[in-house]
Amino acid sequence: MIKFLPICLFALTLPLLNRGPVSQPDTRHQEATSAADLFQPVDNMHHFMEYISEPSYKGLKAALATQPKGRKGWSPVKSGALILAETSALVAERVPEGADAEKATQWRQISLDVYNASKALYGSVGDYEQAKKHYSVMIDNCNRCHQAFANGKYQLKK
């Protein structure tokens, strides 16, 4: 009788093997929604800009004042451009409270313009003329946002 027990157990589990892998409910969307709810701004946009974007801007301005030399000279340019590109993507999702649909669209478009210019600046590392050009476009886009959403305050100098 004991000899037949493994055969009986195998026979009982055989139909389960034909069903394919046991599937779990797809909770990716639910988890993403929950994660989005968890990540709320720590502070207001003014402080976000002051403590994240402004140091990167100042570092870029100093690094591009003269032509950087070698990898060490270009490192602050890469760092600043990368930080500003990635933070502009984050800023795009933080539309000002009370913004109507038109203002929200404008906010996201300017954020995208800053992102594209910062990304181009990052990609131009090693080419001083191209880097200066992309830096200038990026600053123009930052100032467009400050004009539209901060009543013209905080205009950046190239």
What kind of region is each of these model predictions?
Residues 6-15:
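Bacterial N-terminal signal peptides
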Residues 1-3:
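N-terminal hydrophobic targeting signals that begin at the initiator methionine
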